[in-house]
Amino acid sequence: MEAETARAGSQRVSNRSILVLCLVFFCAMIGMAYAAVPLYSLFCRVTGYNGTTQRVEQYSDVILDKTINVTFDANTSNGLNWDFRPVDKMVKPKIGETIKVTFKATNRSPVATTGTAVFNVTPMEAGAYFNKVECFCFTETTLQPGETLEMPVVFFVDPDIATARETKSVHTLTLSYTFYPAKTEKPVASLPVKTESGDSKL
């Protein structure tokens, strides 16, 4: 009898230990999931992995006597009723030359909306050589109903692209943007709705 009681007690302790270990593992997985996104973003910005462009604060001091084609692609997600396009579909700067291009966005919805742009460069191995000095993608953009906004991008292509083994044969780059609704945006369903009396309610 005493042996059975001891075995039962030992089993309860073992079960509690397994439960605690499972909870610790579960919490650790959640923590790693949250940390993975900013760490991956940082890794992409530093290395140019997955076509992520670089952000710099000064212009290139070397300009090669060689040009490169840069084309532009503009998209919006289904949750953002904007018209978004590049003013010029392609430019042909010298490698190392700092130039400015412009994108236009128009809010077609009846309410003010805020968007944030994600971006990349293809071919992806060229992302590390595409340097942005100024870009609307660095901050969120808010447009009033019917408002059209011109948004500049100032960039240069690093001269090292011409000699790096993986990019020296690249002659055309494509800079792509996609606008998504900002996470801080108030859902349309929760915006005030006017009643027949003119009062607003949620």
Swiss-Prot record:
It is a single-pass type II membrane protein. One of its GO terms (molecular function) is copper ion binding. It is found in: Cell inner membrane. Residues 1-16 are cytoplasmic. SUPFAM superfamilies: Ctag/Cox11 (SSF110111). The keyword Membrane applies. The chain crosses the membrane at residues 17-39. It comes from the Bacteria. Gene3D superfamilies: Ctag/Cox11. Residues 40-202 are periplasmic. One of its GO terms (biological process) is respiratory chain complex IV assembly. InterPro entries: CtaG/Cox11_dom_sf, Cyt_c_oxidase_assmbl_CtaG. Keywords: Cell inner membrane, Cell membrane, Copper, Membrane, Signal-anchor, Transmembrane, Transmembrane helix. GO terms for cellular component: plasma membrane. Exerts its effect at some terminal stage of cytochrome c oxidase synthesis, probably by being involved in the insertion of the copper B into subunit I. Belongs to the COX11/CtaG family. NCBIfam families: PRK05089.1 (NF003465). HAMAP family: CtaG (MF_00155). This is Cytochrome c oxidase assembly protein CtaG. It comes from Agrobacterium fabrum (strain C58 / ATCC 33970) (Agrobacterium tumefaciens (strain C58)). The gene is ctaG.
